[in-house]
Curated annotation (Swiss-Prot):
The gene is psbL. It is found in: Plastid, Chloroplast thylakoid membrane. GO terms for biological process: photosynthesis. It is a single-pass membrane protein. Its main location: plastid. Pfam families: PsbL. Signal peptide: none annotated. This is Photosystem II reaction center protein L. It comes from Euglena gracilis.
Length: 38
């Protein structure tokens, strides 16, 4: 687990999942607000 290669891959995976999580939260917030204000 202390290898630099697997470390780099883990960091990239975490960053990608973080971006997807933020995108999902953003989409849910837009849908939620449009549902409320309708």
């Amino acid at each position: 687990m202390a290898q630099t290669n697997s470390n780099k891959k883990t960091v990239e995976l975490n960053r990608t999942s973080l971006y997807w999580g933020l995108l999902l939260i953003f989409v849910l917030a837009v849908l939620f607000s449009s549902y409320i204000f309708n």
